[in-house]
A protein has these predicted regions:
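Long, non-catalytic architectural segments outside compact domain cores
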Residues: 1-65
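Short, compact, well-ordered microdomains
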Residues: 62-100
């Protein structure tokens, strides 16, 4: 894992969140994974996926394969489906933009 002091910015839609990685640049949040852990992907470069754990001293990044990232995003879609059509629609759009 690589650790650094990251910065996150929440957008007007709950799905829009970004981090700045010191090597790979801007990352965007693809899906929440667990409490304090989210799935992020590179915004500009070749598609690289990270499990990011936010901590008081910064963030730690774990690179994961595409299929693992897709699995986490699909689990998030299933959770969002139970929360209602509006939330599911937002996450579905982000899923489609990322994986399809």
């Amino acid at each position: 894992m690589v650790a650094f002091n990251g910065h996150s910015t929440a957008g007007h839609v709950s799905a829009e969140r970004y981090l700045n990685h010191p090597t790979f640049g801007m990352l965007y949040r693809v899906a929440p994974v667990a409490e304090g852990r989210d799935l992020y992907a590179t915004l500009y470069a070749q598609r690289i996926f990270f499990l990011v754990t936010l901590q008081s001293r910064g963030a730690s990044f774990e690179v994961i394969p595409l299929m693992d990232a897709r699995h986490h995003a699909e689990q998030n879609l299933a959770r969002a489906r139970r929360s209602g059509p509006e939330e599911h629609g937002r996450w579905r759009q982000l899923f489609d933009q990322t994986f399809i």
